Amino acid sequence: MAGSLIKIDEEIVTSAVASVTLTGIDSTYDVYMVRFNNVVPDTDTQTLFTRPTISGTMDTNGNKDYAYKIMRAGASFQNTSLTNSDKIEVSFILGTGTSSQEMGNGVLYLFNFNNASEYKFLTLEESNLRHTGELTGNQGGGVFKNNSSACDGIGFFFASGNIDVGAVFTLYKVV
């Protein structure tokens, strides 16, 4: 059925980990979706990042660009962007913390990740509940400027510390 999702991989964090990697991207489909929820760092005020994986290893080359709009319930909207980065920012720039009820949730769509001859790109929709109770959201995208390698997955990590217990990351094929 067109528009269906097939679960490929899921990681449920049962003890704090430095990173989570989802694998299973192959040449079967061109579009994949990642859903994450209840993502919280074990160190206060951290930003969540992502990197594509090549042969199961997160790519750390400075060939990633991203831009998005930050929508804040308690302040003016903001824009953020970066070129030639070694990672793509996922969560709100002010960071997610360890206070009760703070968490990040979101959806990414991945395009051309399985194509070795094309740039890979993603779209992002993410929401955060901050320690102040402010709801924030991000909407934007990023590009992985590598047209010589196919990607087989995607990894997530915080700028510092670990991803805490209870986070769920799921990779789907979009069919």
Question: Positions of the model-derived regions?
Answer:
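Surface-exposed molecular-recognition determinants
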Residues: 2-175
